[in-house]
Every structure is written in C-alpha cells, then in structure tokens.
Amino acid sequence: MKKVLASATILSLMLVGCSNGGNDESSHKDDSSKTEQKDKSSSQHDSKKDSKRNDTNNKQDNQENKSNKEQTSNQNSNAGEQRTSERPTTNSNGISSDNQNKQQQSVQDNQNKYVAPYQSENATRVARYLSPFEGDRSQALQQLPNFETALSIAKNEANMYGSENKSYNDYSIEQTEDGFRYVFSFKDPSKSNTYSIVTLNRQGQPTVVDPNFQP
C-alpha cells in the first residue's frame, strides 16, 4: 500500500513538473515572438526614417540643382545683355555711336590745330558788309571755337540748303548779348551772285540766316 502511494506521489510530481516546463517553454516562445516583432518593427521604423531622409536629401539636391541652373541662366542672360550693350548703338538718323565718336574726335583734332582766321582769295565783302566788326578781334576769337572747326561746321550747314557744293567766301565777327559769334558767307555756284549766310555761336551751333542772300 505504501508503495502504491509513493508511486502515485511521484507520478503527480512528474505531471506538475511537465506542466511547469510546458508553461516555461510557451512563455519563452511568447517572449521570443515579441522580441522578433519588436525588432521587426524597429527595423521597419528605421527603414522608413532612412527612406524619409533620402527623400529629403533628394529634394535638397534637386533644389540646389535648380538654383544652380537659374544662376547659370541669369549669368548667361547678363553676359548677353552686356555683349548687346557693347555693340554700337544707332540713333533715329541711322548714325552709329562709333561714327558720332569719330566726328567728335575730328572736331577735337581740328580744335587742337590752330588756324588763323582768313578770307577766301578774291573774296566779295558779304559777311563783312552785313556785320562790320570794329572791336577787339583777338579777345573775340578767344571766346569762339577754333576758326577751321567753325568754318567746317558752318559750310556743312550751308550745304543743307540749295547747292551742296558751296564755296567759302568771307567771314566777320558779330557781338551779341551773350558774347560773340562768327558770320560766314558761302557762294552758291548754281546761282549768280547768291550767297548763303551762316552764323555760329560760342557753343559751336550753326544757324542759316539767309540761304539766298544777294548783295
């Protein structure tokens, strides 16, 4: 009888031990599963963070590339504008800035070359008749443009009316409210005894007073 009880007790203890072992194994499996899920979730989270970081970096790279392209485009545009601005401009009369610069240089060259005022050979007293000058000629000439330059400007102005081949005849000086001015006469070869009268002030501005003067 005692042996039977002892056997029953041992069997009962074995069953309890097996039950506890099963519970421990099940608990261990649950813990392992939770750990794997946690690791998997963490890995997915890290992957999402990396993906998001890559997207951000790509956006920044795209913005930098776009900014570089815009900067390059602006530089090219500015360079084109600069090249355009360096080209000779043309005014409404079709005269380029280069030609104007050459004309100004020619005027300056003539001013640097002093030529004493003179009458033409066998000149008729026309300008001297219209404007006889009795003042200080040296003082007046100091206030007026170079004679050769003034004569060239006045002749070009005279040739704009009637014949374009007028010849220089004579000159005089006339006193005005603001100083002095030249008075030139140019003979018109297409008309008998006809002269063009042109004045030129201190600023070098010509004025045709009479394109068909007959003394």
Swiss-Prot record:
Lipidated positions per record (S-diacylglycerol cysteine): 18
Keyword match Transcription: no
Coarse class of the protein's main subcellular location: membrane
Biased composition (Polar residues): 70-95
Feature: compositional bias, Basic and acidic residues: 25-69
Domain of life: Bacteria
Gene Ontology CC terms, in alphabetical order: plasma membrane
Name of the protein: Uncharacterized lipoprotein SE_1947
